Amino acid sequence: MAQSKGLRNMTVGSPAGHIFYFALPLLAGSFLQQFYNMVDSWVVGNFVGDGALAAVGVGAPVIFLFSSLFMGVSNGGTVVIAQFFGAGKPERVRDAIDTVYTAFVCGAVPLSILAVLLVKPLLFALRVEDAAYHEAFVYLMVVCAGLVGTIGYNLNAGILRGLGNSRTTLLFLAVSTILNIVLDLLFVLVFRWGVFGVAFATIVAQAISWLFGLTYINRAYPDFAIRPFCFRFDRELFKEIMRIGLPSGLHMSLVALGSMVVMSKINSFGHDFTAAYNVGSKLDSMAFLPIQSLASAVVAYVGQNMGAKKMDRVRKGVRVTLVSSVVWATVMLVLIPLGPTLIGFFSDTPAVIEAGARYLTCIMPFYLLFSVMFCLNNAMQGAGDSLFSMINAILSLILVRVPMVYFLANRFGPDYMYYGIGIGWVVGCALSIVYYLSGHWKRFGSLADK
């Protein structure tokens, strides 16, 4: 079904082949994004200062919090589009694209305005040190003002993933990453704009990537062209998108909220400790990218096969994803002995290097369990059940992780707080396994029947 045009039908053929083929461009794109993040950290850490490096780290969960609602809608759109595409109903795919873009046009600007208004209260709640406060404020104000481009890019990517196309999203991301790096170097090294330059480079690059993606999709796939101002809105279909997307968005918001609460505790130990966490978390995030790409691939794979009512293929795809993810999580343990060397690339401050290396030693073993939880939750989301992920986040990330982080940090010292993050993942993994084995996530069936 339109596979020659880059739209991949995953309801036939090898499950492993489809998942790996779909995941590879996502992985390449994620490496590009992380490469940019590391260049960003290198530029900020070496040419602006550790205070600015801490400020950028503080900003990450805040930005994720603001964008997560529309990212959830995008995920809901991906699942709905994938199921209709797998069921062979292009006219319903068309309806879903129009509906989700109408929601974006009506809601993105108000969200950006709200985000700008909430920057100062959130920084106060995060207890950001005076040394990093001004730079964190500038960074967040600029990025929040430009959230429209970030949300639009994610929406384009979500539509294409639902259609089985992950290669084109790599092109969009390549445009954004290359432009971002060039502008970073220009604004920071040449214009000397500091953190403002880093933030401005980000929003310009993402806005251009969004508009480029819009033009590309409309020319390459006229049957599924994006019409931002058509204002075609299918209310029943939007309810279905929100049934899947709203819990997904709230789940991501809870992840961001939990990260912000943890970040508040991290900030209380000084900007060297915050900078170390920022660099260490970038390193483990990069190592996690293959698992993240497989989990993203399984959403579209499960969605298409649920739409086609092929449960046996769904189960096979989930098994392939789980085994591959656990194997890679084991490989990730190599970051522990390499920690000091890798942290030293971003900062020459001994306290930052030491604290960053300890972070990797504490957190990396828990990724074995986190990979299982992440893949199972994504697979069940592809089947139309995203409510469980939200409930799991409330239980494991808010009710377990946050209290454990504070308890361990206060009782045993700052380094032990990272075990609180790991304990949250242990609980989340156990809940995901039990729920997946229960089979309750299959209850929604194929959207094509509705």
Q: Language-model segments: which ranges?
A:
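Transmembrane helical elements of multi-pass membrane transporters/channels
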Residues: Y21-D40, V142, Y153, S176, ...
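Transmembrane alpha-helix boundary and packing residues in multipass membrane permease domains
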Residues: L26, S30, W42, V79, ...
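Residue-level signal for short hydrophobic patches within transmembrane helices
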Residues: V12, A16-F35, V39, V62-L69, ...
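Short runs within selected transmembrane alpha-helices of multi-pass transporters and secretion channels
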Residues: S74, V142-R161, T169-T177, V198-G213, ...
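Small-residue-rich hydrophobic transmembrane alpha-helices
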Residues: L53-I113, T150-T169, M263, Y277-L338, ...
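Short alpha-helical transmembrane segments in multi-pass integral membrane proteins
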Residues: M1-A23, I81-V148, V190-L246, V302-F366, ...
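Transmembrane alpha-helical segments of integral membrane proteins
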Residues: F374, V400-A409
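Helix-terminus/linker motif at the lipid-water interface of multi-pass membrane proteins
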Residues: F31, F35-L53, L123-D130, L186-W193, ...
